[in-house]
Amino acid sequence: TEKALGKNKSGITGTKNCDLFFSKKNERGAWQKPEPIEGDVNTEDDEGVISFSPDGTTMYLTKARREPNADTSVEIYTSTRTGAQWSAPQKYEITADTLSAFGHPAVSPDGEFLYFVSDMPGGYGGKDIWRISLTEKEGTLENLGVQINTPGDEMFPYIRSNGDLYFSSDGHPGMGGLDIFKAKMNDSGFWQIENMKAPINSQADDFGITFGEEESGFFSSNRGDGRGYDNIYSFELPSISVWISGTVIDKDDEPVPDAIIRIVGNDGSNQKEFARKDGS
């Protein structure tokens, strides 16, 4: 934030207007100094919360909208990548509504839908999560419904390749402030919603979760910061390795060579193995 282009304070955060930055890891695995994103994306206004098309050539971003004698609101813009540069953002028209806020874009992994947050009419109160088709658009605007949205605020959606939806909410039962939730659709078409609990969630605001490889990723939180500033955290759920050994014997305590062994997990998994010649 301190290195952002704008000189004014954000009407949303109260700090200096935000720009978009990127950072890479060096050969030792340490994060390098953040650099402003290349091109003409950053301006005097607030830029934040981005998502990319599956091919990485289109960026969807949240951008502040300022009008005289009105509260600061946000809109969704797009930028396209040509070579190493991002183009100047262009407003992405979702509806003709010029009064409501539109932000927190999240492109589905297949590139079919754009999920976003809005307080437009037709919701369930506060800010709701909506989606619209990126390929058809006309007539595809859809509120995610009462199972996801509450009279409170639902924000920062993120879609994984398996269809699971992650979002932050202060309307679902949580630990305090904004909590991160996981929503999985069952075979009947209903969302099953799960609070991510500690250590992902805290009594502060926890939001903006994204995933990288397997069960690792990043999220933001203002926990433990007396100034209320947001910090980026990383997380990883390590895989669990279980070593099982034994010997297959018959009623006479003799080893059974080439015996078929079934390992059944409580998640329904069923693995077939064969014993050695000595029954082990």
What name fits each language-model region?
Residues 1-247, 251-260, 272-278:
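Short, conserved micro-motifs composed of acidic
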